[in-house]
From Swiss-Prot:
Matches recorded under PROSITE patterns: FBOX (PS50181), RASGEF_CAT (PS50009), RASGEF_NTER (PS50212)
GO annotation, cellular component aspect: plasma membrane
Positions of the N-terminal Ras-GEF domain: 1116-1244
Keyword annotations: Guanine-nucleotide releasing factor, Repeat
Biased composition regions of type Gly residues, renumbered to the chain: 849-866, 1264-1279
Acidic residues: bias regions: 170-186
Compositionally skewed regions (Polar residues) per UniProt: 256-271, 911-935, 1059-1076
Keyword Iron-sulfur: no
Function according to Swiss-Prot or TrEMBL: Promotes the exchange of Ras-bound GDP by GTP.
Protein name: Ras guanine nucleotide exchange factor G
The Ras-GEF domain, residue ranges: 1317-1548
């Protein structure tokens, strides 16, 4: 009976005999069996026991990370740690899965000897820091093993992403991600008993299998991505290959890290990772050939993806996806279609896979084969004093029944921190290895290479030797350290004690090697039934022997392959044959890796050769010889390849060898004979694997294409929140360090304050119901006196109304008016009001009510907002008169007598008072919102300290005494329609005339009260006023208004925009974006108000004079000179402050002067995502009040930014907007469709709209003094030679084809243009100039990018315009100085002045200034005799033009001329003036402090807007290509040539008679 005290998490022992009785004893050994204690200091080790040989394998402990850091599938950015919740769930699962026997870990191993059965009992004690021990098998599992029932363990996914094992005894239900047709599955584990031998093995993380032919264990890599429940603590990291082969239907073929091939043999037990029993196991167990009747439970609900869907994928996406798959996956996809086959044949894809596999399967102590050739070799002195004892490794003492093993002293190199460490090996160890691989070939190779095996090599830092977890070694390595003993006794019980100590070999720079020899004591007890034997001490160190053997093999292979693959000489055929015959004794993975390393020749080797010679003399010879060796190794029948070796070989062949070459074909044929890899369909990839793949796709295009492949892929992308992750990744790229979130800025209002404020100004639903009831009662009370009045009016139709008589004022006209008011009260003219007369609409900024007595933000009083013209007259009657309804934007002015009493900030009382009876006051009702846009909270000053909420209480005082009636206003007869039915009686009716146009409702009666206001004045009147209306003149800004309504006159704290309610109430911007009309004034009864743009005065006969209401100036309205970025974005998207559209446009047009585009976009996205307040009452209420209005504001800014500044977007911003508009933005928002449409339009026209800058540049100016020379003309003006002169001379003209010296051209071309009419020349010059001017972007004028050489690329069009200006200037000088005769020069100057005159008539001031600058150049200005020859008419033209473009008075004459140009007329302004103004505005010396200056932005915007207006009006001249081409290639001379020729034409102190 074997008992194992297992404190390790990764110990597996396979079982080869039927299990007997199992006892549940902890740390108690059976007295009938001997105890073998194995002490292992490594926490994570895998030990396989076979015939007394113990081969522990050290693996790297990587903590409790979920994903493997070295797994290319789950990259480092996806790796994380277990959360406490995950650990709690894992512990709970362990408790449920384990019975009372918590520490039962019993396995039984039986071994067959020659005479009797020998029982080897191994008690393995592993040092582990964890105090808890967990069983390898639960009670239910053990009972199932003993009973022979099959157990299927299925991994179930828990919310934390871990996997746990649950036992199922039925095979009917299968997970959708599993497939029964595959042999190995990583998501399900099945432990089956062998039906022939009734043996069962259990697997936790590492599975083993026994091969009788080799008497060794087959170690496989773990297949579970996370530790099973049997682990006490999740300290195990998943295997690399297992994590990558996570799919439920992935075929896993012998995932052992060493050379184990599954060969058919008798009495063989294989514990593999199958999900179901199926007939495919026959490849691994030929004794089970009769098990073909096993049913497959493949899930047929998942159908393979059609080939056509894959054809829709892009090649780049293919390569990205395939880069995360293994070779078997690619081989399966390779057979899908020719298109995929061509893509998979991409060698770069396989090269990447090859590098991944090398990293995974390479040993950390691997020695690079080219190190000895590339780096200097240090001599070392091997001081081994135990060589004499090492030659007796295989000698057995058979006579005395004593085993004497003298193990080799191997120097292990574990000093990873020492740059000079290496793995040394003694001569005796070479002899031991030679003996183990055979006396014929192995010994000869060892003897020949003995002198080269102990050469120390510097540790290399190449990528293919990155330290990875050490995989288990193959059987041959175990055999090197096993003791071949012959047992003559009947019963032998071996007791092996292993001390795992690693000896490091440190090589000093001087080359001295210090060998630390380990003394390991092992005792073997031989007990006989008749007598007891003696104990013999053995020197054994398995760990050192394993590493030493590996390093020895490494060194031997390096030397052998260097000898067999030289560059010039030919290796011996006999030696090569001996090596091939014995190569199966080397680890197969190590052998293949060395051959591949040798094939990839580094360029540093023989670097003195040229590339061609190096390929011919070095690379190709070595590669051909390596290819031949590789083919022979593959064809060697004794060499068995494991899974990792096959991956390395296949990826290497596909990546580095041409598929059509004979070498590639031969290697592929050899691999097909060796072993066939089974593959799975890509459509069956599990959802977890799909999500892991998709998370590595960092492009919206890749995810979008994958989303359209199949419904399953679409679902995987949808449920994994990949779009949100991609959205956040893009935003992280725009984020700047040190940036404060806009919602965390203490200088701004918090969301809680905003919500509380809107909660105060909006009544609760109960109050709104009361308001509805009060409104209905009011309507009923209004109808009763109106009926009585109608009866009395029938008897008094012919009586004129007296001034003080209030009983005889009704007539037919008034009756019609009252009927119309009643219809408005009943809501008969409204769409949503119905016949009930009242319609409630909650405060929804996006859906205002239009019906009845509307309550809502867009309800316009009792009439719902419809305007009516009565009797064909021009007098407008507002629908809210007499209605009593109110809304957030309701209009309360009307034509009939209305008494209004304000009791609370949100209470408005209205009443219709008939003229024929006494005054009747209607009951008060409460309005849901104060009917004015000034109800919005005032802006707080942008200071670090947040101000407290402002009070909105309104107190009323007693009304003043009634004033006398003012003088009667008479209306001209022409103002009334002759067809009106009540024109004669209209004088008894008081009708208000709105001060705004008839298409715009009048302003509201209430405005916001300042915080410091404690009382207001309210006047009430019940008298009847007889007045007439006055016509509204379009040319007069002053209006006169008489009303009979009771109004509240309040001094506003700021102007609030009026409501431009044109019937469309879905746009939230009407709440705060539209400006109020300062000319509209509400007055008390019997008062005459004269409203103007500056002030309004209120007078009456009783000399009750109220102070004039002054309209505040725009410059004094809430102007914050300096603010930070958060305050600016808050101002642009505020729902509490009315933001002027000019400020928004100015900030968006000039934002690049203080921030970048990425910063602005990121701030707007921060503003869009509003953190939810903690004091909200309901989600719907929160969205309606705060979230939706702010998001709509942000979307408006986004739309403006996309429409006007899309060229400023980089690739990241464009991708971010794509994700935002497709997957993040609220699709129910009213501006979503507009925003998507604008973005799509810009995106589709991006390539076509960005035209290249026209290749028109000027010659390089060599003028001293910065190129700002000027000369005074005959008219007293002066012209700048280049535009840069206006800016300070910092601009340098660039050299181009126009600026070349035209000496190679024919002389006739100089006269071709001059011979044309001046008018035609001016037209063609204007067309060329406007083509450049129209391409200038607004962003080019910012930050003086045109004047700094480092930022020329930011203003290419301005630079093109400057170069063109300089070219024209030099061309004028060239064509004048070219002529030798004075008369000819005079004609050319006269022609140029005529051209300039025509340019002025075409408003082409830019080219005009260029010609005048050429005439004022020193080379031309000094030709006084030439200028004297000009005619007086031409001299007058020159004087006028020089005066126009003079710089005197800051270009006053030119500015005046430009201001008189018709805005619709085509014009090209002189850019020099604008550049000088922009330079002054953007000068940093004028900056008073840190922050954003809105005033400066407004000034910049005004200039940019002017330029944009000029760009909108192109010229309509006919274009002549030949003339245009000639004008584009103007001939110019250099400065030196111009000066030299000028001195030749008119030398100094010459006379006229001396000249021609």
């Amino acid at each position: 009976m074997d008992k194992i005290n297992n404190e390790n998490d990764k110990i597996n022992i396979s079982i080869k005999a039927p299990i007997g009785n199992i006892e549940d004893n902890n740390n108690n050994s059976n007295n009938n069996s001997n105890n073998n204690s194995v002490s292992n200091s490594n926490n994570n080790s895998s030990i396989s026991i076979n015939s007394g040989s113990n081969t522990p394998t050290n693996s790297k402990n990587r903590g409790i990370k979920i994903f493997d850091l070295d797994d290319p599938f789950t990259s480092k950015r996806l790796s994380g740690f277990f959360s406490p919740e995950s650990l709690a769930e894992l512990s709970k699962l362990q408790l449920n899965d384990t019975d009372n026997n918590d520490n039962l870990t019993t396995t039984t191993t039986t071994t067959t000897t020659t005479t009797t059965t020998t029982t080897t009992t191994n008690t393995i004690t592993s040092k582990n820091n964890s105090p808890n021990t967990s069983p390898l098998l639960s009670s239910t599992t053990i009972s199932s093993i003993t009973s022979g029932a099959p157990i299927k363990k299925r991994f179930e996914r828990i919310p934390s992403g871990l996997s746990h094992v649950t036992n199922h005894y039925d095979d009917d239900d299968d997970d959708e991600s599993s497939s029964s047709e595959e042999d190995f599955d990583s998501t399900e584990l099945v432990c089956r008993p062998n039906k022939t031998s009734s043996t069962t093995a259990t697997t936790t993380t590492t599975t083993t299998s026994v091969s009788p032919l080799t008497s060794s264990f087959v170690m496989r890599r773990p297949s579970s991505p996370s530790p099973p429940p049997s682990c006490s603590s999740p300290t195990l990291s998943p295997s690399l290959s297992a994590t990558r082969r996570l799919s439920g239907n992935l075929v896993k073929v012998a995932t052992d890290s060493d050379n184990q091939s599954l060969e058919p043999c008798n009495n063989k037990t294989i514990v593999d990772n199958n999900d179901n029993d199926n007939d495919n196991n026959n490849n691994h167990n030929n004794n089970n050939n009769n098990n073909n009747n096993n049913n497959s439970t493949e899930d047929i609900s998942i159908k393979p993806i059609c080939n056509k869907t894959f054809l829709d994928l892009d090649e780049k996406i293919y390569l990205k996806i395939f880069g995360y798959l293994f070779a078997e996956d690619l081989c399966s996809i390779n057979r899908v279609s020719k298109h995929l086959c061509n893509i998979i044949n991409n060698q770069q894809l396989w090269k990447d896979l090859f590098s991944i596999y090398i990293k995974i399967y390479s040993e950390p102590s691997d020695i690079y084969i080219w190190d000895e050739d590339l780096y200097s070799i240090y001599n070392n002195n091997n001081n081994n004093n135990n060589n004499n004892n090492n030659n007796n490794n295989n000698n057995n003492n058979n006579n005395n029944s004593n085993i004497s093993n003298n193990n080799n002293n191997i120097n292990n190199s574990n000093g990873n921190n020492n740059p000079y460490f290496t793995g040394g090996v003694s001569n005796s160890s070479i002899g031991a290895i030679g003996g183990s691989i055979g006396s014929s070939a192995g010994s000869n190779i060892a003897l020949k290479l003995r002198s080269n095996t102990s050469i120390p090599i510097i540790e290399r830092g190449r990528s293919n030797t990155i330290a990875m977890p050490t995989p288990t070694f193959i059987n041959e390595i175990n055999m090197l350290n096993s003791n071949n003993s012959v047992n003559n006794n009947n019963n032998i019980s071996n007791n092996n004690t292993i001390n795992s100590n690693n000896a490091g070999v440190i090589i000093n720079p001087s080359g001295t090697v210090n060998n630390n020899i380990n003394n390991i004591n092992s005792s073997n007890s031989i007990n006989s039934s008749s007598s007891s034997g003696s104990n013999i001490n053995l020197s054994n160190n398995n760990s050192s022997t394993i590493h030493g053997s590996y390093i020895s093999s490494n060194l031997i292979l390096n030397s052998v392959l260097r000898k067999f693959t030289p560059t010039t000489s030919v290796p011996s055929t006999n030696e090569v044959t001996d090596f091939i015959e014995s190569c199966h004794h080397f680890p197969s993975k190590l052998l293949i890796c060395k051959l591949v390393q040798r094939y990839l020749v580094p360029r540093e080797f023989q670097r003195h050769l040229s590339d061609i010679d190096w390929v011919k003399m070095v690379e190709r010879p070595i590669q051909l010889r390596v290819g031949k060796l590789l083919k022979k190794v593959i064809d060697q029948k004794k060499v068995n390849f494991d899974y990792g070796t096959m991956l390395i070989l296949r990826s290497f062949i596909r990546g580095y060898i041409q598929s059509t070459s004979d070498m590639a074909k031969g290697l592929i044929v050899g691999l097909q004979k060796k072993q066939v890899l089974k593959v799975f369909d890509i459509s069956r990839v599990s959802d977890i694997l799909l999500i892991k793949i998709f998370r590595n796709l960092d492009s919206i295009k890749d995810l979008s294409v994958c989303q359209r492949v199949s419904k399953r892929w679409n679902k995987a992308i949808a449920i994994s929140s990949l779009w949100e992750q991609l959205y956040l990744n893009y935003r992280k790229k725009l984020h700047h360090e040190g940036d404060i979130n806009i919602w965390d800025d203490p200088s701004l209002h918090t969301v809680e304050y905003l919500y509380e404020f809107f909660d105060q100004i909006q009544p609760s639903p109960q109050q709104q119901q009361q308001q509805q009831q009060q409104q209905q009662q009011q309507q009923q009370q209004q109808q009763q006196p109106q009926l009585q009045t109608n009866e009395s009016n029938n008897n008094n139709e012919d009586i004129k109304q007296n001034d003080n008589n209030n009983n005889n004022s009704n007539n037919n006209g008034l009756n019609n008016l009252q009927k119309l008011i009643e219809e408005n009260l009943e809501g008969s003219n409204l769409s949503n009001g119905g016949n009930s007369g009242s319609s409630f609409s909650p405060f929804n900024p996006l859906s205002g009510s239009n019906g009845g007595s509307s309550f809502g933000p867009f309800g316009s009083g009792g009439g719902g907002g419809s305007n009516s013209n009565i009797g064909g007259s021009s007098n407008q009657l507002n629908s809210s008169s007499g209605g009593g309804g109110s809304g957030f934007l309701a209009m309360a002015s009307g034509g009939s007598s209305v008494s209004s009493v304000t009791s609370t900030p949100s209470t408005i009382s209205t009443n219709c008072t008939p003229t024929g009876g006494s005054t009747t006051n209607s009951p008060n009702f409460q309005s849901p919102m104060v009917s004015s846009s000034t109800v919005l909270p005032p802006p707080i000053p942008f200071s670090p300290n947040l101000s407290s909420p402002r009070s909105m209480s309104i107190s009323l005082s007693s009304p003043p005494p009634l004033p006398n009636k003012p003088p009667e206003l008479k209306l001209p007869d022409s103002s009334l329609s002759p067809n009106s039915s009540f024109n004669n009686n209209l004088s008894s009716t008081s009708i208000s005339i709105p001060s705004t146009p008839t298409t715009t409702p009048s302003s509201s009666l209430l405005t916001f009260i300042p915080p410091n206001t404690t009382s207001t004045t309210t006047t009430t009147s019940t008298t009847n006023i007889t007045s007439t209306t006055m016509p509204i003149s379009a040319a007069t800004t002053t209006t006169t208004t008489t009303t009979s309504t009771t109004s509240t006159i309040i001094q506003p704290i700021q102007p609030i925009p009026p409501v431009n309610n044109n019937g469309s109430q879905s746009d939230l911007s009407k709440i705060s974006d539209l400006n109020a009309n300062p000319n509209t004034t509400t007055t008390t009864t019997t008062n005459t108000i004269e409203s103007s743009s500056s002030s309004s005065s209120i007078t009456n006969n009783n000399e009750n004079i109220i102070e004039p209401i002054k309209s505040p100036q725009p410059s004094m309205i809430n102007v914050q000179k300096l603010m930070n970025l958060n305050q600016l974005v808050d101002k642009l998207t505020s729902i509490t402050v009315a933001t002027e559209i000019s400020e928004v446009n100015a900030c968006l047009a000039t934002y690049r002067t203080f921030i970048s585009t990425s910063q602005l976009v990121e701030k707007l996205f921060q503003r869009y995502h509003i953190p939810r307040a903690s004091n909200i009452k309901s989600i719907l209420d929160w969205k309606q009040r705060i979230e939706t209005p702010i998001q709509v504001k942000v979307c408006k800014v986004f739309k403006k930014l996309i429409d006007d500044h899309f060229d400023d977007f980089n690739g990241t911003i464009i991708e971010l907007f794509k994700v935002f508009l497709l997957h993040i933005i609220d699709k129910q928002s009213p501006l979503t469709n507009h925003l998507i449409r604008s973005f799509s339009r810009k995106l589709s026209g991006e390539n076509g709209s960005t035209g290249s800058v026209i290749g028109i540049t000027g010659g390089k100016s060599s003028r001293k003094g910065g190129g700002s020379g000027s000369g005074s003309g005959s008219g007293g003006g002066s012209g700048s030679s280049i535009i840069g002169g206006a800016v300070g001379g910092t601009i340098k003209a660039s050299q181009s084809k126009i600026g070349r010296m035209m000496s190679v051209r024919k002389a006739q071309q100089f006269n071709d243009i001059i011979s044309l009419p001046a008018e035609e020349i001016a037209k063609q010059l204007t067309l060329i100039e406007f083509e450049i001017f129209g391409k200038i972007q607004s962003s080019e004028f910012l930050n003086q990018s045109w004047a700094k050489e480092k930022t020329f690329h930011l203003a290419p069009n301005i630079r093109a315009s400057i170069d063109r200006f300089n070219t024209v200037t030099k061309w004028v000088c060239t064509i004048i100085l070219k002529e030798e005769k004075i008369r000819t020069r005079t004609k050319i100057m006269s022609k140029l002045l005529k051209v300039a005159k025509n340019l002025r008539s075409y408003s082409n001031f830019h080219t005009l200034m260029a010609i005048l600058s050429g005439l004022n150049e020193i080379h031309i200005y000094r030709l006084k005799f030439t200028q004297q020859e000009l005619k007086p008419k031409i001299q007058k033209i020159s004087s006028e033009l020089q005066t126009l473009m003079s710089v005197e008075g800051n270009h006053e004459a030119y500015r005046t001329e430009l201001s008189n140009v018709d805005p619709k007329q085509s014009c090209i302004p002189y850019l020099g003036v604008y550049l000088k103004d922009l330079t002054f505005i953007q000068d940093d010396t004028n900056k008073k402090g840190d922050g954003i200056n809105i005033k400066q932005s407004l000034n910049l915007y005004n200039i940019l807007k002017t330029i944009q207006n000029f760009q909108k009006n192109p010229y309509s001249f006919e274009e002549f290509p030949k003339i245009k081409e000639t004008l584009l290639n103007l001939p110019v001379w250099t400065e030196d040539n111009l000066y030299r020729v000028s001195m030749q034409r008119e030398p100094r102190n010459c006379k006229r008679s001396d000249l021609i």
